[in-house]
Amino acid sequence: MKPKIHQQAYDRLGTLDLESFLNHLLLETPIPFKGHLIRCGSPRIRTFLKGISCAFCGIQATISAIERTADGLKSSSYHVNLYHVREDGTEVMMTSDHIHPKSKGGREDLFNRQPMCIICNLKKGSKILHTNPNAIQPDT
């Protein structure tokens, strides 16, 4: 199993061609995948209409995975997660960052979201970067 960098464990049903995922996202159509219909309408996933690169460090998603939370609940539905795959095979999850954090009054709409890798998102936390551009440093 390839190492992953994200916040929780997921059960992976499989991977989908990134271009195919983006087409479904643009057309707002569910993805038929191994007997499941995967929705593409959540605010989190619609963030990737803005791009598939981290707004801070610039790494780009290279795979889309059909996954569900691995918490043992059968009610957990499958959804799409995007990952950047490093040369060593490590998968870095791409997330939907709130530009103006919700904890500081930020809205839940698409205008207040940007794609960001989990590493930068965890470093950013609840900081507002446009007022403190040096708040986080990218990995080198």
What is each model feature region?
Residues 57-60, 102, 119-123:
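Cys/His-rich metal-chelating microdomains
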Residues 61-113, 128:
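Histidine-centered nuclease catalytic patch
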Residues 109, 113-135:
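Short Cys/His-centered divalent metal-binding micro-motifs
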